[in-house]
C-alpha cells in the first residue's frame, strides 16, 4: 500500500470512528451499535484532528498521479469545509435538530438498509436507541439558547414529532418480523428508553431554548465566501452567483411563457401546470408507471450512446417502506452504500393511502403527474443520481467512493434533465413545461441562498420569492426555506453545478471539434466520482 493510500485509510478510519452513523452510511459496519459523541471536549478534539489532516493533505509530497492529486485536493476541500462548519459556524451550538437528526438517521439506516440479517441489525438498533439519551444530554450542554434562531426552533419541533412517530410506528414494524422473543422485548425496551429521552429533551427545549431563541441564521458573507472557496473550490463571489441566478431566472421565464403559449395561448404557465397535474396514472398503477419510465430512460441512454451504464448495475422500483411515507410523499432515491456488497439502488414510490382523506389522496395523485414523472426519473435514476453514484461507488479511489461534492452531484442531476430533452427523450412540450418550471425554482434557490446568508434577506422574503416566482405552495416554500437557513451553499449548488458542466462541455467540444464524443465526455465526467467541479475541469483538460 502506498503512502498516499495509507493516509486516506487513516483519515477514513478516524472519521468513521468519530461518526459511526457516517460509517454505517458508507457501508462500514464496525460501529453499527454506536452513535457519535458530541460532548464539548470531543468536538474540540474532532476539530484538532481535522486540522491535523488538513495539514497532512496540504503538505503531502509523495509521488502522486494526476488522479491521486485531484483526490488529495478533493479530500482537503471536504476537510476544510468540515472545519468551517465545526469551528467557525458552530452548528452544534445553535441547531437543535443536528442532534435529533444524528440519532434518527443512525437508527433509520439500520432499519432501511438490508446489509445484514435482521436480528443483527436490531441488536445494533437497540444499542443506538439507548444512546439517544447521551447524545441529547450533550445537546443540552452545547446549545446556547440565545444563539438558536427562531426558525431552527420550528425545525426542531417538527423533527421531534417525526422522531416520536419513528419510535412509535417504524421500529415496532421492524421488530414484528423478529422471531426471537427476548430480542424483540429488548428492542422495545430500548424504544421506550429513547422515547423517554426525547420527552425529557423536549421539556428542556421548551423551557430553556424556546423563550430565549433569538439567534441569526445568516452565516454572513465572509463565511459564505469561505465555504465557496475552501469546500467547493469556487472563485466566483456571491454577487456573481446571484447575478447568474437572476439571468437564468429571466431567460427561463421567457421560455416558459413561449412553451405555455404553444400548449394553450389562453393560460399563464403556472395555471397550465396546475391543470396538467390532473393527468396522473391510476392509483393502482403508480409504482408500475415509475418502473416503466425507469426502464425506458435506461434503455434510451444505452441505445443513444449517451453514457456507459456499468455492468451489473441495478435499480429496483419499490413501494416506499411504511416508515418512510410521512417524509416521502411522492418518490425518493436510496443509493447503495459504497462499501456494501449489495450495489442495488432503490427507487421509492409512495402509494396512495386509501385511509387518508379524499382531498389528501387527490393531492398526492396530482403529485405523480405524468408530465412531471419523466423528469423525476431522469433526475433521480437515469442518467441522474443513481447512475452517477453507482459509477462513483465502483471507483478504485476510496476518496471518490465516499466524498461527493454537492455542486457536482446535484449539478449532474439537473444537467441530465436538460440533456435528455436535447437528446430527444421526449418531444412533449408539456414535459418541457414541468422541466422549465423546476429550473425557475433552481434559479430562485441561488438568489435566495445568497440573499438569506449574505444580503439580510428575511425568512418571509425568501418564502415570497419561492411563492411568487417559482409558484411553490406556501407550506412547501416554508419547508424549503427552513432547510436553506441551515444549509448555506447547498441550494445554489444545483444550478451552479449544471452551468459549470455545460460550460465544460462547450470547452471540450470546441477543443476536440469533430472528434468530440458525448458518450466519452460523460464517461470521463462520471469517472471523476463527485469531485468538486473545478477539479473535474482540470481532469478533463
What are these regions, as identified by a protein language model?
Residues 1-541:
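N-terminal maturation segment of proteins
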Amino acid at each position: 500500500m502506498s503512502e498516499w493510500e495509507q493516509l486516506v485509510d487513516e483519515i477514513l478510519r478516524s472519521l468513521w470512528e468519530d461518526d459511526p452513523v457516517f460509517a454505517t452510511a458508507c457501508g462500514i459496519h464496525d460501529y453499527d451499535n454506536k452513535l457519535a459523541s458530541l460532548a464539548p471536549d470531543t468536538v474540540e478534539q474532532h476539530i484538532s484532528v481535522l486540522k491535523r489532516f488538513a495539514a497532512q493533505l496540504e503538505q503531502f509530497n509523495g509521488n502522486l498521479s494526476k488522479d491521486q492529486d485531484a483526490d488529495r485536493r478533493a479530500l482537503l476541500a471536504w476537510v476544510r469545509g468540515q472545519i468551517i462548519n465545526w469551528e467557525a459556524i458552530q452548528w452544534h451550538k445553535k441547531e437543535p435538530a443536528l442532534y435529533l437528526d444524528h440519532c434518527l438517521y443512525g437508527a433509520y439506516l439500520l432499519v432501511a438498509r438490508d446489509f445484514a440479517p435482521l436480528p443483527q441489525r436490531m441488536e445494533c438498533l437497540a444499542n443506538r436507541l439507548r444512546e439517544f439519551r447521551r447524545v441529547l444530554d450533550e445537546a443540552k450542554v452545547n446549545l446556547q439558547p440565545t444563539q438558536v434562531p427562531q426558525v431552527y426552533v420550528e425545525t426542531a419541533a417538527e423533527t421531534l414529532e417525526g422522531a416520536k412517530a419513528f419510535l412509535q410506528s417504524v421500529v415496532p414494524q421492524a421488530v414484528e418480523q423478529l422471531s426471537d422473543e427476548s430480542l424483540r422485548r429488548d428492542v422495545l425496551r430500548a424504544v421506550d428508553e429513547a422515547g423517554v429521552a426525547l420527552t425529557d429533551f423536549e421539556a428542556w427545549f421548551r423551557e430553556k431554548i424556546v423563550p430565549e431563541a433569538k439567534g441569526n441564521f445568516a452565516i454572513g458573507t465572509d463565511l459564505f465566501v469561505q465555504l465557496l472557496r475552501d469546500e467547493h473550490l469556487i472563485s466566483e463571489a456571491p454577487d456573481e452567483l446571484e447575478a447568474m441566478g437572476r439571468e437564468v431566472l429571466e431567460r427561463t421565464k421567457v421560455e416558459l411563457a413561449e412553451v405555455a403559449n404553444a400548449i394553450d395561448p389562453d393560460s399563464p404557465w403556472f395555471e397550465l401546470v396546475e391543470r396538467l397535474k390532473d393527468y396522473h396514472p391510476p392509483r393502482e398503477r403508480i409504482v408500475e408507471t415509475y418502473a416503466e419510465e425507469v426502464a425506458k430512460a435506461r434503455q434510451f441512454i444505452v441505445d443513444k450512446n449517451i453514457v456507459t451504464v456499468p455492468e451489473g448495475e441495478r435499480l429496483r422500483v419499490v413501494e416506499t417502506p411504511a416508515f418512510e411515507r410521512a417524509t416521502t410523499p411522492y418518490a425518493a432515491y436510496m443509493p447503495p452504500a459504497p462499501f456494501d456488497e449489495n450495489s442495488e439502488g432503490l427507487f421509492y414510490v409512495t402509494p396512495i393511502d386509501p385511509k387518508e382523506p379524499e382531498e389528501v389522496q387527490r393531492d398526492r395523485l396530482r403529485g405523480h403527474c405524468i408530465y412531471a414523472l419523466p423528469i423525476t426519473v431522469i433526475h433521480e435514476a437515469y442518467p441522474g443520481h443513481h447512475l452517477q453514484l453507482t459509477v462513483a461507488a465502483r471507483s478504485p479511489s476510496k476518496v471518490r467512493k465516499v466524498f461527493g461534492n454537492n455542486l457536482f452531484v446535484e449539478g449532474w442531476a439537473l444537467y441530465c434533465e436538460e440533456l435528455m430533452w436535447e437528446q430527444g427523450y421526449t418531444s412533449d412540450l408539456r414535459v418541457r413545461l414541468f422541466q422549465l418550471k423546476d429550473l425557475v425554482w433552481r434559479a430562485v434557490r441561488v438568489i435566495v441562498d445568497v440573499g438569506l446568508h449574505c444580503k439580510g434577506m428575511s425568512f418571509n422574503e425568501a418564502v415570497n420569492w419561492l411563492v411568487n416566482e417559482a409558484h411553490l405552495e406556501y407550506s412547501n416554500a416554508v419547508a424549503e426555506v427552513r432547510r436553506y437557513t441551515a444549509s448555506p451553499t447547498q441550494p445554489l449548488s444545483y444550478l451552479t453545478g449544471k452551468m459549470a458542466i455545460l460550460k465544460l462541455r462547450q470547452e471540450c467540444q470546441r477543443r476536440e471539434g469533430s472528434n468530440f464524443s458525448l458518450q466519452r465526455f460523460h464517461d470521463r465526467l462520471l469517472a471523476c466520482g463527485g469531485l468538486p467541479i473545478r477539479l473535474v475541469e482540470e481532469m478533463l483538460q
